[in-house]
């Protein structure tokens, strides 16, 4: 269950249970019936947010962050397998906001052009890699791209990362 935790002083309880629940959520997408383009209206995409309490997704532990990231990637890989069986032109990607993972999502794009707008022309944060930094296993052939989107009024750096299917020209 997705939940915003405003009580920052409370210790996060039940971490192993929450991680098992997150893994079950990711595995569920292997058999999930995909929404049709008509279901999303004129948006051109369908997304699923990370279903955890914010204090788990934004926890300072490297291990917990890596687990959340890997669950997003596993979800996207399961969705991509489902989307390949459909005849439509669909693309799947993880859209990650760093360092606030709670805002991250897995997105199923129904429009190649809309996916291209997220995909970008280059990897602006290269040679950095979330996959290397966190020991993540990416599906074969998938790409990783990072962009610095920090605004002057923000307190710290904000990065957007896309980990998803390659976009052939």
List each language-model region with its residue ranges.
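Charged, amphipathic alpha-helical stretches
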Residues: 25-35
């Amino acid at each position: 269950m997705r939940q915003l935790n405003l009580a920052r002083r409370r210790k996060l309880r039940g971490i192993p249970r929450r991680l098992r629940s997150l893994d079950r959520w990711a595995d569920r997408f292997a058999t999930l019936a995909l929404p049709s383009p008509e279901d999303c209206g004129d948006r051109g995409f369908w997304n699923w947010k990370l279903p955890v309490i914010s204090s788990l997704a934004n926890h300072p532990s490297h291990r917990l962050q890596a687990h959340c990231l890997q669950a997003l990637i596993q979800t996207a890989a399961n969705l991509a397998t489902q989307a390949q069986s459909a005849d439509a032109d669909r693309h799947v990607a993880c859209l990650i906001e760093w360092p606030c993972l709670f805002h991250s999502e897995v997105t199923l794009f129904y429009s190649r052009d809309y996916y291209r707008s997220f995909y970008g022309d280059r990897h602006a944060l290269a040679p950095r890699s979330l996959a290397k930094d966190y020991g993540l296993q990416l599906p074969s052939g998938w790409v990783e791209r990072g962009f610095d989107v920090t605004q002057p009024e923000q307190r710290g750096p904000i990065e957007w990362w896309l980990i998803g299917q390659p976009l052939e020209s």
